[in-house]
Amino acid sequence: MLKELINRLLWHPKSSPKDYVIIYLHRGAPDNKKSISVNNIIINDSFLVFNETHIPFHRILEIKNLKTGEILYKKVDIDGLR
């Protein structure tokens, strides 16, 4: 589901990837989170690539529309860590 959503944001003719941000778990960053524009990623089988950084899908916490504030995806917090 997550990979399909990201592919849709990247490739659907009515979608503008620069309008979306991916927030992901990055230990050591402020609040253990970093964000990147969907416009700046390359999607792979089980991870995203941003510059030289590989981000596994399981580290994606949220996908958000920057224009509307709509949250398209939010990882379920099952262990109280997020």
UniProtKB/Swiss-Prot annotation:
Q: Which InterPro entries match?
A: MJ1316, UPF0248
Annotated protein name in UniProt: UPF0248 protein Mevan_1298
Q: Name the protein family.
A: Belongs to the UPF0248 family.
| Any coiled-coil regions, as ranges | none
Pfam families for this protein: MJ1316
